[in-house]
Swiss-Prot record:
The lineage of its organism: Bacteria, Pseudomonadati, Pseudomonadota, Gammaproteobacteria, Vibrionales. The IMP cyclohydrolase activity resides in the N-terminal region. This is Bifunctional purine biosynthesis protein PurH. Residues 1-148 form the MGS-like domain. One of its GO terms (biological process) is 'de novo' IMP biosynthetic process. Transmembrane segments: none annotated.
Amino acid sequence: MNNARPIRRALISVSDKTGIVEFAQALAERGVDILSTGGTARLLAEQGIAVTEVSDYTGFPEMMDGRVKTLHPKVHGGVLGRRGQDDDVMAKHGINPIDMVVVNLYPFAETVAKDGCTLADAVENIDIGGPTMVRSAAKNHKDVTIVVNASDYDRVIAEMDANDKSLTLETRFDLAIAAFEHTAAYDGMIANYFGTMVPSYGENKEGDEESKFPRTFNQQFEKKQDMRYGENSHQAAAFYVEANPQEASVSTARQIQGKALSYNNIADTDAALECVKEFNEPACVIVKHANPCGVALGKDILEAYNRAYQTDPTSAFGGIIAFNQELDAETASAIVERQFVEVIIAPSVSAEAIEVVAAKKNVRLLECGEWTTKTTGFDVKRVNGGLLVQDRDQGMVSLDDLKVVSKRQPTEEELKDALFCWKVAKYVKSNAIVYAKGDMTIGVGAGQMSRVYSAKIAGIKAADEGLEVAGSVMASDAFFPFRDGIDAAAEAGIKCVIQPGGSMRDDEVIAAADEHGMAMIFTGMRHFRH
C-alpha cells in the first residue's frame, strides 16, 4: 500500500524564522496553499508569497494580545482529521484538511536567560497554540507532516520533488518523533523554571541554594552514538549529549582520526580535559581509569608532556593525553614514538601533527576548540532509583585564601607547588594524595579507603620511577583524621602539606607537621571526588 501523502495545504507559524521564507516559497512553487498567523504571515506576504491568515480562514480573529490564534476546530480538525474516516464530519463543518504543520515555539529559554526577566515576561513566552498544533500533527502523522526544525526544510522539499509532492510515512514518523522531542524539551524547561519559584510565588530567590534545584529535574539529551559496549563488554551503551553543550568539551570535540570512541575513552577523556583546563601555562594531563597519573607544566607542551609522562610511564601506557594548547608535530612525534595511547585531545591540532599521528591509525585524535569560561551547570550521579544533583566543583583557592598553620612558613616555591598540586588533587579519586615539585606531579595516590595508604602509594609510585620526593609538596583532597598520613609523608621526604583542615584532630596533625619541620597550609575547602 502506498503510504505517501501529498502536501496540498500547510500551516506555518514560527518564532524562529530562519529559512522560513525560502521554505514557504518552495512550498508555494509546488502548489501548496499556505495558512499562517501574526508575524509569520506578515513576513511571508511582504516577500510576495500568497498566504491566508488563519483568522480569515476560521472567521475568528486573533484575540487577547495574540494568546488565542490557532485554538479553533477548523485548525485542529484539519490537522487531527483522519483521512478516509473523518471526511464527512470535516465536510459538514467546513474543515479543510491541513497536510503539513510548520511550527517552532516561543523562545522561552532565551527569555528566562535574560537579565531582569520577570515572571510576567516568562509567562508571556509560554507557547500554548504552538505545542498544541505540534502535538496534534505528530499524533496524526499517519496523514500529516509536522516540521519543527529548520534543518529539515531542505530534506522535506527534496523528498517532495522525488515523490510527486508527497512525503512517505517513514519521513512523517521520523519528523513526528522530532516534534515530540521538541515539545518534551520545551515543557521540561518551563517545569524547571517554575519549579525553582517555590515556595514563594513569583520570586526566584537568587543565591538561595534551594532555588537552584527545581521540584522535578527535566533535561533532554540527544543520542550522539551507539557503542559496541559500555564499561564492560556485557553492557550495552550509547553516548548522549545536551542539545546545546558547553564549549570545549568531550561532547563537542571533533574526532580527526582513529577508532570510534569507547565508553571508557569518553569518561577518561572528559576527566583529562577538565583537569587540563585548570591551568593557564602550557600543561599536559595523562589520565588512566579516570585518574590523573601524570600532570605537568612546561615552557611549551612538549616539555609539559615529557614531564607528565615521567611521573608514571607504566600507568601512562594506554592512557588519555590532554593539552591546553595546540598539539604540534614535535609533541605528537614524542607521543607516538614513545608510548601506546588511546586518545589525544587538544584545543587545536596543527596540520603537521595530524600527519604525524596518522601513522598510528587507531589513535583517536580529538580537537575540542578553545575555552573561554569555566564549565558550569550541574554534576549528576545516578543511584538506584534516583539522581544526586549538585553544582560542579568549581571551587579553587588563591594565595590570599591560604592559611599557614605550622610554625614553619612555606617557601615561595612550595607555595607555587602547593597551588599546582591542589588543582590536580581536585581531579583524583578520593582518598586523593598528590606529591608535586616544580610544577610536576611526583606521585599520585588515588582511591584508597584510608588516606594514609594513598600517601604511601604516592611515595611508592615516585620511588618506582626514580623520582626524588625530598622537598616535594603533598596535597590532600580532604583533611587528615590522624597524624599517620603526615608521618608517612615525612618519611617519604615531603616538606610542605596543603589540605583543607577541619579535622577534630587538627592540633595533633599540625603538631606532627611541626615535629617534622614541615610547612602546613589549610585551604578551608574540600575536594572529594567519587
